Amino acid sequence: MVRIRLTRMGKKKQPFYRIVVVDQRKRRDGAYIESLGYYDPIKDPYILNVDVDKAVEWIMKGAQPSDTVRNLLRKAGVFKKVDELKRTKKEENK
């Protein structure tokens, strides 16, 4: 199964995360399929940069976000766009 999850970057005591698409059997910091953005929780306010179009594309293909990434993507407005696309597809099929 393909997951959207965080991979840790940065120095000791200064975490920085990439939001990546990865096979769930891979290691946390292992090879990934595609990078969707990054998240820096240390800055005040935190920095969240997500390529919304890529994230929507992967979710529509069936990629499952982890709990933390799901919350971050919700803050970035990704799921609103996914819901709109699903509604338009349902209307087209009728």
Swiss-Prot record:
Domain of life of the organism encoding this protein: Bacteria
Keyword Ribonucleoprotein part of the UniProt annotation: yes
Gene3D superfamilies for this protein: 3.30.1320.10
Protein's GO biological process: translation
Keywords, sorted A to Z: Ribonucleoprotein, Ribosomal protein
GO MF terms, alphabetically ordered: structural constituent of ribosome
PROSITE patterns in the record: RIBOSOMAL_S16
Any single GO CC term annotated in Swiss-Prot or TrEMBL for this entry: cytoplasm
HAMAP family: Ribosomal_bS16
Protein family according to the UniProt entry: Belongs to the bacterial ribosomal protein bS16 family.
Protein name as it appears in the record: Small ribosomal subunit protein bS16
Species per Swiss-Prot/TrEMBL record: Thermosipho africanus (strain TCF52B)
